[in-house]
């Protein structure tokens, strides 16, 4: 793989040309008393995460929850109505009763706190079956993304939003907005940066992919998703501890940056891979790793569907280079991490542990093999599962 590095460009332009900033701080940008008599809408975990992504510019060029024209265009052709690449509609669903009562400026709440507002411009019917078929490639209610879609309200509100503050939450050291990540990249002088998206603890195969990529670029952004995930996924706080010990012991500090990615998982496989790549461009990243079954769940998507879908766009449209890697694993005969391209041995020689198998071992108090994950990571996971009882 040959990658040509720019000698001058440090940061790619955000999608749409400008990084959206919809932060409006109470007491600074407006008088909180203005909100006293406005209607309020409580957000779900996913919608609260979407509000943050919109407000900080992570979802540039979107300035709010999408309207009907963009909604249909995204579903039908993976583009906004103006032709800009975009793969998943970012909507604000409500019930019919709520839709009939909400208009104008609506204060958005989460956890009992005012977190932002939306200026409602449109209300339109959600095409749930159509959205499920096109975005998730299935209408199976067992699919977690489809289940969430079917459970939400039947009407979508559209309009520009304001975000009152960045919810740094449990990870204040690692929670950075796109503008803040861009500032770190610029300060470090990285001409090229690769991002790695994960919702799982990093095992040796992930480490291998990251370090191969790091041979080709100046910096690595380890960008774990910490928004809402499936109930059986490893909790975000445990994963972040695992990332910290891994980076402290096995990565060059000056060439790596750990920063959390506050989006919620949709488990939309190929479509979500595009969303993850485009949003990383907004964070100032030039390259994005897509491995096997990116953002997938169960057997709904083919192993490399999330790589092949990028052919729907011209490379210059994306503004970020996709690094496509095959499945990697430890081969006991080769004595190292390999891929099908480099290993001549059949699967009986390979050490491959599924997420389910890893969780079974941890619940049983078993030690994960060193060929699968670093001992420091294994210990973090073991302690976390032991504490759960």
Curated annotation (Swiss-Prot):
Its EC number is 2.7.7.4. The keyword Transferase applies. Signal peptide: none annotated. This is Sulfate adenylyltransferase. InterPro entries: ATP-Sase_PUA-like_dom, PUA-like_sf, Rossmann-like_a/b/a_fold, SO4_adenylyltransferase_pro, Sulfurylase_cat_dom, Sulphate_adenylyltransferase. Keywords: ATP-binding, Nucleotide-binding, Nucleotidyltransferase, Transferase. GO terms for molecular function: ATP binding; sulfate adenylyltransferase (ATP) activity. Belongs to the sulfate adenylyltransferase family. Pathway: Sulfur metabolism; hydrogen sulfide biosynthesis; sulfite from sulfate: step 1/3. Pfam families: ATP-sulfurylase, PUA_2. The keyword ATP-binding applies. GO terms for biological process: hydrogen sulfide biosynthetic process; sulfate assimilation. HAMAP family: Sulf_adenylyltr. It comes from Deinococcus deserti (strain DSM 17065 / CIP 109153 / LMG 22923 / VCD115). It catalyses: sulfate + ATP + H(+) = adenosine 5'-phosphosulfate + diphosphate.
């Amino acid at each position: 793989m040959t990658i040509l590095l720019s000698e001058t460009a440090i940061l790619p332009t955000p999608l749409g040309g400008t990084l959206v900033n919809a932060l409006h701080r109470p007491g600074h940008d407006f008088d909180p008393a203005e909100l006293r008599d406005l209607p309020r809408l409580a957000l779900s975990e996913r919608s609260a995460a979407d509000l943050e992504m919109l407000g900080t510019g992570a979802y540039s060029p979107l300035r709010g929850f999408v309207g009907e024209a963009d909604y249909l265009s995204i579903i039908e052709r993976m583009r906004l109505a103006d032709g800009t690449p975009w793969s998943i509609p970012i909507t604000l669903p409500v019930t019919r009763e709520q839709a009939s009562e909400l208009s104008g400026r609506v204060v958005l709440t989460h956890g009992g706190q005012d977190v932002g507002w939306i200026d409602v411009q449109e209300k339109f019917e959600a095409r749930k079956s159509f959205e499920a078929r096109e975005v998730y490639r299935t209408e199976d209610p067992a699919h977690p993304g489809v289940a969430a879609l079917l459970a939400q309200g039947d009407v979508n509100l559209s309009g520009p939003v304001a975000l009152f503050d960045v919810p740094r939450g449990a990870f204040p050291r690692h929670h950075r907005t796109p503008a803040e990540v861009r500032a770190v990249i610029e300060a470090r002088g990285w001409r090229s940066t690769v991002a790695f998206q994960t919702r799982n603890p990093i095992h040796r195969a992930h480490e291998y992919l990251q370090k191969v990529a790091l041979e080709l670029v100046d910096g690595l952004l380890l960008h774990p998703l910490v928004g809402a995930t499936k109930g059986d996924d490893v909790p975000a706080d445990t994963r972040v501890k695992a990332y910290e010990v891994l980076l402290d012991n096995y990565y060059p500090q000056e060439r790596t940056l750990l920063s959390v990615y506050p989006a919620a998982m949709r488990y939309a496989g190929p479509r979500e891979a595009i969303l993850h790549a485009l949003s990383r461009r907004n964070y100032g990243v030039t390259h994005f790793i897509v491995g096997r079954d990116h953002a997938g769940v169960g057997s709904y998507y083919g192993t490399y569907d999330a790589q092949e879908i990028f052919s729907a766009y011209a490379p210059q449209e994306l503004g970020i280079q996709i690094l496509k890697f095959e499945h990697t694993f430890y081969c006991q005969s080769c004595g190292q991490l390999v891929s099908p391209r480099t290993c001549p041995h059949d699967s009986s020689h390979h050490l491959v542990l599924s997420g389910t198998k890893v969780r079974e071992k941890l619940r049983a108090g078993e030690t994960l093999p060193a060929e699968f994950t670093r001992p420091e990571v294994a210990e973090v996971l073991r302690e976390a599962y032991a504490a759960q009882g």
